[in-house]
Every structure is written in C-alpha cells, then in structure tokens.
C-alpha cells in the first residue's frame, strides 16, 4: 500500500468514526421532554394521541396503523427523543445499521458492516428492537435485511440511503441539499422493499444525529417522524463491553431510547454489551419495546 493510499484510507476511517460517534452523541442540543416535537427551535408539545400513518406511506407492508407524531410548526418534520412515562417502565433499544454509499470496496475486501450475532442474541433474549438501516446496508446484505424485516420482533426504520449529512458541518460527512435529501430517504425505502423487508416503519434517524430546521423542512415531503435518542451507549469503536453496558444502565429512564450500532467492524462489542444490559434492566423491572410502541403511548 502506498503512503497516499494509506492516508486516504485513514482519513476515510476517521470520518466514519466521527460520524458513528456522532450518531451516539447528538448535536449538542439538550434533550426535550417527550412526547414533544423538536424542530431545532423551542419545542412544541405534541397532542396527547399520536396519529397513525396512512396506508401507502413508505412503511407499506408493515402493520396497518403505525403511530407517528403530527407535523411541527409550519409543517416541519417532528422529532421524537423519548416517551414521557409515569408508571410503565419501558425502554427501546435501537441499532444503527450503518454503511455509507462509498464503502462497497471495503465490504468487497472483507470488512463487515453487519452483525448477525447481535441479531441472533436479540432473538434469543426475546428483545424487540428498532433497526435504523441505511439503504446501502440493505443492498449489501439483502438476505439479512429481509430476515430482520420479516421478523415481528423487529422493525426497520430509515437511516438514509447514503449516510450523508442533512446538515453541515456534521463530523466531516458529505452534505445533501434539500431535494437530494428527500430522494436519499426515498431511495432507502426502495432498497428495503427490494430486499423484501416487510416490517418497515416511517421513522428516520439523521446520519450523525445532525439536523436543524432546514433539514427538518427538507425531510417533510417524506412524511416521517425523526427519531433521536436520550441514552448514548458509546459503543462506536468501543473495546470494553462492560463500559458500554455501564453507560447504558446509568442513563436509562422509563421511556428511554438507547442508540447503539449493528455494524461489526465499527462497533465490535455491542452484542456482548447487550447481553449484559438486558438481564440487568429486566431485573430493574423494565420491559423492552420497539420505538413504535413508545411513540404510540
């Protein structure tokens, strides 16, 4: 390998690492009480009952009524972070299946962006989960996308096709403009359908977790609910599953959304951490649910 090639590869890895860390670190804005619509401006309380996405939305083939939040001020895409709960101790584990549009050569050379052992462990532990998948990931691993999207234990949500940013700057990710952003989301849903995934839902997670009002406005034609998180697992590039588990356990509250990753090369200890987190949270009286159940409360 020449020095220039090595430098380019290192730079690409650094950008990916920052973006994955960003997916678990938020955008610097403080969490808002849910159920609230967060728009980048002051939060506006959502109506008590979320609406249901009509048939023919991107989640076609999923259960007929998938709860979504109503649009925010001026039609901006609503943002969900956690459910406001008083008695029911539920928590949603979410996993970003990250693969960018330019990582095909790395996958071809043997790098693994999937994590089948994680999915197997979630099944064995009987933990429902929401997988925020990029369209490029679904193209690379269509059999896995179909299996995940056909399992009632899971739901597939949209993490863009390309894993490019919807706001700039965002951890060095290339940025999409308004029209390209909507097309990127649509392309991801098309990739899920082509793979044969059925349990897809009209939820979206911004690459890197980066967004502002302009991004929410650009996303509004897709008619999705943006889903962020209130608990950062810190699993991206982590080496110690105990540290990841401890961070999750310290942050979880009733109604929490936990962000983790389903990407073996970039989050190698996630599966081990999950096997530590699940029994401990159950011991504390928590029940695991998909994001759709939290939004529907």
Predicted regions and their residues:
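N-terminal pre-catalytic segment of deacetylase/amide-hydrolase enzymes
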Residues: 2-113, 145, 276-278, 284-297
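Active-site beta->alpha N-cap acidic-glycine motif
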Residues: 58-157, 162-168, 172-173, 190-194, ...
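Active-site-proximal beta-strand/loop segments in catalytic clefts of secreted hydrolases
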Residues: 95-98, 132-136, 159-161, 205-209, ...
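CE4/NodB-like, metal-dependent polysaccharide N-deacetylase domain
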Residues: 119-133, 155, 173-209, 249-261, ...
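His/Asp/Glu-enriched short active-site or ligand-binding loop at hydrolase and phosphoryl-transfer sites
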Residues: 210-211, 215-251, 286-295
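Catalytic grooves of carbohydrate-active enzymes
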Residues: 253-292
